[in-house]
UniProtKB/Swiss-Prot annotation:
GO terms for molecular function: 5S rRNA binding; structural constituent of ribosome. The keyword Disulfide bond does not apply. NCBIfam families: bL25_bact_ctc (TIGR00731), PRK05618.1-2 (NF004128), PRK05618.1-5 (NF004130), PRK05943.1 (NF004612). Part of the 50S ribosomal subunit; part of the 5S rRNA/L5/L18/L25 subcomplex. Contacts the 5S rRNA. Binds to the 5S rRNA independently of L5 and L18. One of its GO terms (cellular component) is cytosolic large ribosomal subunit. This is one of the proteins that binds to the 5S RNA in the ribosome where it forms part of the central protuberance. This is Large ribosomal subunit protein bL25. HAMAP family: Ribosomal_bL25_CTC. SUPFAM superfamilies: Ribosomal protein L25-like (SSF50715).
Length: 198
């Protein structure tokens, strides 16, 4: 598991104009830390640092250490605002993490054995991904980087639901806890094969 860290500075000059100046003159991204029992804190991060961090998909489902003026905060990325036509991050929202409090986070699903599954390799079907990420609830130490969806034994016409997933100990799927056993993926008959049978 990779450790993620960012250096940040406390930001006292607030507002839309101040944020624009920060992005333009200092190549920094304005950000805010929310949550916990503390007041929201306005910070700034070097644009190149946050851009490099988010190149790794795992950064979105990992606890990140923010180094701010000699102190540290453990956070999750809650939201990113991006430029409409560039890949640049315009603003970031972080959520404070408290070690002994459960948190909710969205983690990606990694689909494995799709091409070698019974439904694809032996029955000529095609995999259809219904969702690509899922919300989990757990303690920060238990937060998974991703949840694996093994399609090896899935046949044509079968659907994989949240209840079929193997999740790490201490991790709860939020939708399932609320009685929503969502479809995750399925294998359906190939359209080419269907047309050939007509």
């Amino acid at each position: 598991m990779t450790d993620f860290a960012l250096n940040a500075e406390v930001r006292s000059d607030l507002g839309k104009g101040a944020s624009r100046r920060l992005r333009r003159n200092a190549a920094q991204v304005p950000a805010v830390i929310y949550g916990g029992d503390k007041e929201p804190q306005s910070i700034s991060i070097l644009a190149k640092d946050i851009t490099k961090l988010i190149e790794d998909e795992a950064a979105f489902s990992h606890v990140i250490t923010l180094n701010i003026a000699g102190a540290t905060e453990t956070v999750l990325i809650k939201a990113l605002q991006r430029h409409p036509s560039k890949a640049a991050v315009m603003h970031a929202d972080f959520l404070r993490v408290v070690a002994d409090h459960k948190l909710s986070a969205v983690v990606p699903l990694h689909f494995v054995n799709a091409e070698t599954s019974v439904g694809v390799k032996q029955q000529g079907g095609e995999v259809s991904h219904v969702i690509s990420e899922v919300e989990v609830s757990c303690l920060p130490k238990d937060l998974p980087e991703f949840i694996e969806v093994d399609l090896a034994q899935v046949e044509v016409g079968q659907i994989v639901h949240l209840s079929n997933l193997s999740v790490p100990a201490g991790v709860e799927l939020v939708a399932l806890a609320h009685g929503n056993d969502l479809a995750v993926a399925n294998i359906h008959a190939s359209r080419v094969k269907e047309e050939g049978a007509e």
